Amino acid sequence: MHSNVGLAGLAGLLATASVCLSAPADQNITSDTYFYGQSPPVYPSPEGTGTGSWAAAYAKAKKFVAQLTPEEKVNLTAGTDANNGCSGNIAAIPRLNFPGLCVSDAGNGLRGTDYVSSWPSGLHVGASWNKALARQRAVQMATEFRKKGVNVLLGPVVGPLGRVAEAGRNWEGFSNDPYLSGALVYETVDGAQSVGVATCTKHYILNEQETNRNPGMEDGVEVAAVSSNIDDKTMHELYLWPFQDAVLAGSASIMCSYNRVNNSYGCQNSKTLNGLLKTELGFQGYVMTDWGAQHAGIAGANAGLDMVMPSTETWGANLTTAISNGTMDASRLDDMATRIIASWYQMNQDSDFPSPGAGMPSDMYAPHQRVIGRDASSKQTLLRGAIEGHVLVKNNHSALPLKSPQLLSVFGYDAKGPNALKQNFNWLSYSPAIQENHTLWVGGGSGANNAAYIDAPIDAIQRQAYEDGTSVLYDISSEDPEVDPTTDACLVFINSYATEGWDRPGLADNSSDTLVKNVARKCANTIVTIHNAGIRVVGEWIDHENVTAVIFAHLPGQDSGRALVELLYGRANPSGKLPYTVAKKVEDYGSLLHPSLPETPYGLFPQSDFDEGVYIDYRAFDRANITAQFEFGFGLSYTSFDYSGLQISNPKQSPQYPPSAAIQQGGNPHLWDNIVTVSAEIKNTGRVAGAEVAQLYIGIPNGPVRQLRGFEKVDVSAGETTQVQFALNRRDLSTWDVEAQQWSLQRGTYRVYVGRSSRDLPLTGSFTL
């Protein structure tokens, strides 16, 4: 949209826009010229410099690219057809021993193939609050990609962040808090790339709803993709934050998103690509489109786009033509090719890497070579990951763990396994509220993959019953089942579904709520497990006296049932915490409950205005003093923990803005200078060992009441005490100064809060800068 627009041209565009502002409110705007200039143009596209750890890879890449013909350079920039099951392919250059690239979904496990694992989802890892677990999951999951000949893992996800409660893809990301999301994406990128598989962190940026995410036809008229309209401060403090952590970790590629940003498409937005990503953050890798997200030709390349997937109709020979006629500099094409090849070298894929797509058959149901991606060494991480993402939110009368039950009654559609386990079976053409025919272990769309097996709750419960001599009655289809009055406990299983392509129809469904209430009416010990692909409100029944325990089980992957039984019987102690806020009623989410819809005069150009600024989720609840059902960071354990001994070091006196320095990957290196250290002691005051997530929140002057700025998950034996430490760096303590275009330390008193959740903070203190 903004290609080659100089100051005079920009002034003209702004003048045009000012004229258009007088359009009648009851008539739709019909031309995108109305929006010109709303996303500032940033040109030229900066060349990769090979800074830091990228130096050797860039030296090799420049030498490689210098040997290429113009056509070979162009071929590196767009996907091509190949006889394999990869999501996308880059063609080989045999004369230079470049075998091409296979890129494949997703951040939840390898999609579209066999002999791989279905891992706990991003949301499930977010609920674990475990950085070491996030890294180990990434290492072992990426190893499966490597064995299958996949060069680029299309993940992890930190966009959507989770602004909209009903958004369909929130389950793919970690949390709607940028700090938690950023800490976990750093570990995920670093872990996956440690085994030589490139990550493609996505979806950059502000892809916060599925509704109108792509342009489409409405009554024969084209409707543009939704525009996420945001101010610079909110962009930096919320949505760019986790992408910055991904770049800091060295993410080899970034996927630009379908939506528009300030009315310029994400894959041709020079402000977000050239300005924020490649200049401010010092990104050294390449920018890849989401599938079909290219909406411009040369303008996209000039705006910072490097690779189009799965193919292109507007680049190809047009790139060389553009260079010859001066529309595009030859150096831009060289930089595109160099960034792509440098990432290949950075991952050491030029040596001892399987042939691209070697284990990705084009047709899984036709004869093909068996390539085993799974490894027995992953079993522990699969199970541990599944366990730690469960969050116990209610446990009256110590209903859990179960105590040698003689009779268990199991109810609910979510208890059983699927009738069939097929390739990517759960990509639906619409989004129902629930998956009513089977347990939910993963969401839908490109983030889903094929499990090696599904261990459903009813199967795991019956295995345990066999060992214990417990009788099990079950009815997994009735909405109002009969209940044996002598049963020790009634286990009710429901779910809440979400998928790519559609936003959720709500945060609860009447059928599931009715089932819970019907069972609770007849059973004095009703234990509810919810497999939820996002926020699920429970106000209809959470306070029922017979609902004794509730678990948010999220999306645990293939070891779902096995993990749950470990928790139900106390062999594992719940340690998960909510990575989002559960409201008492959906109205408490305000304007951020539903996705934005087209409205006159923007019926043809849907607008989503991020007017709430940084106040989403718990920040919004804190500002409005709304009592949540279960606050951000909340989660129960079978033991108890006391907090004491808060200590705050003398802060390092620092200038308001970071000292000038050469930009490294991740931005100004002084952003990571430590300013102050906070420590506290945690004592396990219960009778069993457990893990606690100690959370640090900071009240920054002139900012939200409090913001997460540290967390540590520690194992503590019964009666023992351990210390946790939180190092706070410059970025942690800064706000974005729009005028200075810098992170700025605030002068004044910073409040310090340490505790169990965003609302349970027994330790408080302060320091002054």
Curated annotation (Swiss-Prot):
Q: Which InterPro entries match?
A: Cellulose_deg_GH3, Fn3-like, Glyco_hydro_3_C, Glyco_hydro_3_C_sf, Glyco_hydro_3_N, Glyco_hydro_3_N_sf, Glycoside_hydrolase_SF, Ig-like_fold
Q: Which GO terms describe its molecular function?
A: beta-galactosidase activity; beta-glucosidase activity
Q: Record keywords: Secreted included?
A: yes
Residues of the signal peptide? 1-22
E.C. numbers: 3.2.1.21
Its pathway?
Glycan metabolism; cellulose degradation
Listed under GO biological process in this entry are:
cellulose catabolic process; glucan catabolic process
Known catalytic reactions: Hydrolysis of terminal, non-reducing beta-D-glucosyl residues with release of beta-D-glucose
In terms of superkingdom, the source organism counts as Eukaryota
Uppermost EC category:
hydrolase
Pfam families named in the record: Fn3-like, Glyco_hydro_3, Glyco_hydro_3_C
Q: Where does the record say this protein resides?
A: Secreted
Per the UniProt entry, the glycosylated residues are N28, N75, N262, N318, N325, N396, N437, N510, N546, N625
Can you quote a single GO CC term?
Answer: extracellular region
Positions annotated as active site in the UniProt record: D290
Family to which this protein belongs: Belongs to the glycosyl hydrolase 3 family.
User: Which protein are we looking at?
Assistant: Probable beta-glucosidase M
Mind giving the lineage of the organism this protein is from? Eukaryota, Fungi, Dikarya, Ascomycota, Pezizomycotina
